[in-house]
């Protein structure tokens, strides 16, 4: 959508159909740009559904970005294992038409703010090498690369990367 103002951005939570939208945008984007196969789409849909079925408001976060009622992106914080590795950033996506316009930064900052308020000591996320705009955003917000390894996953050879953000003073 051309010509929108960031002030038009609304962050909401769950609404009917959003699991399908998030899964669809992940599947389409990663198929078209990276050749990911059906196992990626089914994993996103299954794990996102499981997360939302067990969602606990004080432990987990889930935000959907919309502009003029249209889906623009999403992000979640999965706090189920926060005592071990930290709270996990998941299902972070901004639709291609809205990338590079501040929506990703808004979503990521909202998730970091939630983690601070929840008292989490660390936040982490898994991604893969080659997503440079996302990496730039993660590093801009203080995340640091702490692990990487080669893996065959979703029909492709990729280099998985783990980024962490320490929230302790």
Q: What are these model-predicted stretches?
A:
Residues 95-101, 129-130:
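Active-site acidic-Proline motif in GNAT/NAT acetyltransferases
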Residues 3, 7-10, 121-169:
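C-terminal "cap" of GNAT-fold acetyltransferases
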